[in-house]
Every structure is written in structure tokens, then in C-alpha cells.
């Protein structure tokens, strides 16, 4: 739900009504509604995919290290991790919505705030740090891994996610 709300607010800020004039035969209001609905549905699906990715990743890591966590606990922890990240995202989107900051130009959770529009700085996102830390807690508390191994895996996850963000910024 939080992902859907943040996607809806983001689409509210990102949708440029002038760019929607270019499609003939479709009413502008209908096109705007379709765009917002598509953004909301995409936000919901991305949340489900994130939960499954974190769950499968934590399950694989715990199987590699031969710990015996409860699968329900890992799934619950994965849901909690994604929920916390989505709440942070929703709060940031609400703040940006209230102050009229364009999410394409500014991201107040990244280094992009110092140089608006710079996508490479936008790749260095505070949510990555939060997500990696929460993944470490998930592996340690629920996955029954030692804090040392959980921290190492969390750092590897952080580097992987940062690399994906940088590749996405460069493309």
C-alpha cells in the first residue's frame, strides 16, 4: 500500500500534462488517469517482487551457511524490510510533494541533492544503506547467522545494489 501511495504521488509530480497532448484521439484527463493507475499498479508489483527477491536471497544465504531458520520468519522479515523501505520512500515522496520538488530532478535521500539532475550522484542513495543494514539484521536475528557473516553479506549486497544503481544512472 505504501509503495502504491508513493508511486501515485510520484506520478502526480512527474506527469507533465503538456506531454500528454501529443496523443490524438484520447482525452487528456483519461490519459492522465491511465498514467496514474499504471504507476500505482507498477508500485504494487515492484513491492511484491522486492519481497520475493529479499526472501529468496535470505533463504539461499541461510542454506549456504547451513543454518535452520524458520521459513515463515524469513518471509516475515522480508516483508518487514520492504515495508520499512517503502515507508521511508513514502515519507520522502510526501515531503517532496509538499515542497513541490520534482522527483526526477531531486532525491533528498541521495547525494543528488547537492547537484540536482546528476544521475550518478543519485545512485548513492541512503535507502541502500538502510536496506543493507536491515538485511544484515534479518540474516543475523532471523537467519541465525553470526553478525560477522551477516555484515559481510550485507556489504556485498550494498556493493551489488550500488553497482546496479550506477549502471542504471549511466545508461
Protein language model annotation of sequence segments:
Residues 1-89:
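Selected alpha-helical membrane-embedding segments in polytopic membrane proteins
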Residues 80, 84-156, 164-165, 169:
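Hydrophobic alpha-helical transmembrane segments and adjacent short intramembrane/lumenal linkers
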Residues 1-7, 155-164:
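Hydrophobic core of alpha-helical transmembrane segments in multi-pass integral membrane proteins
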Residues 6-42, 96-124, 167-171:
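Membrane-helix interface segments in multi-pass membrane proteins
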